[in-house]
């Protein structure tokens, strides 16, 4: 059985199946912030969704990160490394991309175990 959360006409924010939690792409709510601020917002949203599923960041299986500008890579990494618990850094890919809204600097897609 697939459990879906916050289902809308286009997407669900999260789905759970066979002990695995899949998050939709998470983007910042306040896109006026700099890269560090946007990353912190996105990681907070990920924390909240994983908590709703009964999981947490220590159980992330994979994170795909899309950034608007590669010059923001150091700022992304600084916030990420402060957020990830020691010994629990998941596999991760970071690519430059044109995001759906030009003011977004980052979007993250996470898969986690329950």
Residues covered by each model-derived region:
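Short, polar/acidic, helix-capping and beta-turn segments at strand->helix junctions
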Residues: 1-114
């Amino acid at each position: 059985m697939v459990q879906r959360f916050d289902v809308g006409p286009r997407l669900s924010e999260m789905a759970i199946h066979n002990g695995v939690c899949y998050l939709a792409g998470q983007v910042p709510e306040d896109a006026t912030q700099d890269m560090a601020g946007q990353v912190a917002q996105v990681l907070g949203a990920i924390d909240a969704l994983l908590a709703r599923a009964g999981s947490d960041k220590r159980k992330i299986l994979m994170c795909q990160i899309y950034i608007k500008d590669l010059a923001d890579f150091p700022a992304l990494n600084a916030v990420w490394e402060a957020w990830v618990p020691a010994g629990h850094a998941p596999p991760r890919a970071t690519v430059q991309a044109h995001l759906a809204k030009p003011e977004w600097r980052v979007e993250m897609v996470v898969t986690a175990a329950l």
